[in-house]
């Protein structure tokens, strides 16, 4: 008899503070789903955590738009939301390190994927909460960039593997997921083409975890291939 359950996995390389950022030397997040007698539902993979935006190098001030120190011109992509943080996405065998799929320029892919898969109703509704994708730049600036509280997110990881393969036998293919963070200069832009007040701005992620659904008690195939369209 098969049983479905949910797993929550913490990244392997998060420092003791629980916070990661490109600016502070943590450009790569690695999560490992080790070898186990279970079938992984790839469509259920979700990355969740908190996003903070800081206007100074010390990470103590939010860009609230009140004076030079507040970086009033600081902006980000309202069309990508939290996906702006991801520069590359890699899936590989956790033991042999054989690469299954490697997507470079992930933000460019998502900028083409999201308009096709989501409408304005989605953006104004659940995507504004789950992926921090907003209807316009002002909503993103006011609710994410200038927010004095952490912005919570929980997103899927669209890729050829997650969209094209239903179940993955973890007893034969333990999975390692590697997320390369985007540089701050790629995540932010200036609304008036001047960068004097935003040169020290950076984004920071915390409380990161990967959740997924696995099914146990199911016989995994003795042979076969992973058939999917790589992106």
Where are these regions (language model features)?
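Short, low-complexity Pro/Thr/Gly
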Residues: 1-231
């Amino acid at each position: 008899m098969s049983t479905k359950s949910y797993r929550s996995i913490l990244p392997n390389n998060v420092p003791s503070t629980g916070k990661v950022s490109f600016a502070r030397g943590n450009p790569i997040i690695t999560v490992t789903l080790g070898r186990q007698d279970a079938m992984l539902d790839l469509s259920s993979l979700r990355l969740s955590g908190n996003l903070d935006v800081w206007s100074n190098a010390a990470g103590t001030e939010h860009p609230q738009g009140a004076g030079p120190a507040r970086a009033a011109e600081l902006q980000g992509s309202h069309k990508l939301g939290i996906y702006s943080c991801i520069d590359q996405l890699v899936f590989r065998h956790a033991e042999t390190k054989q690469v299954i799929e490697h997507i470079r320029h992930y933000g460019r892919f998502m900028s083409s994927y999201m308009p096709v898969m989501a409408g304005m109703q989605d953006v104004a509704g659940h995507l504004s909460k789950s992926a921090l994708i907003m209807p316009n730049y002002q909503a993103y600036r006011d609710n994410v960039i200038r927010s004095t509280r952490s912005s919570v997110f929980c997103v899927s990881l669209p890729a050829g593997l997650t969209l094209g393969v239903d179940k993955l036998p973890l007893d034969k293919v333990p999975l390692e997921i590697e997320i390369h963070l985007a540089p701050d200069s790629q995540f932010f832009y200036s609304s008036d083409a001047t960068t004097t007040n935003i040169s020290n701005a950076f984004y920071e992620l915390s409380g990161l975890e990967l959740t997924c659904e696995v099914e146990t008690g199911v016989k995994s195939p003795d042979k076969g291939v992973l058939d999917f369209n790589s992106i």
